[in-house]
Amino acid sequence: IVHSMAHGLSALYDTPHGVACAIILPTGLEYNKTAAGERYRAVGKAMGVTGIDEMNDVEAADATIAAVKKLSADVGIPADLKGILKEEDVQFLAESAFADACCPGNPRDTSVEEIKELYRSLM
């Protein structure tokens, strides 16, 4: 979902694609946590999250998401799309993300309405 949502942002707002992905990543991780939380342990382990092997899947996912947010902040990635994303573009962006070739690879089924809410949560 992250990559799909970032494509439209990059095109519409001339935001570098990697930056758009990084801004959206924590939101996408939260969104997919229930469908792929167990996969987050490997990411957290690679990021050096302390004690991750002793955590249950939910704790490991939360710790990994926190580590991603910290890394983003440490390298100056904005935490949201305030001042970038406009409400009048949300419908178009959500429809584009839903139709994007990357969307079917998301671990959780989604909808245009859910993607709209994800964008709005970043405003």
Where are these regions (language model features)?
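Active-site segments that bind and position negatively charged phosphate/pyrophosphate groups
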Residues: I1-A67
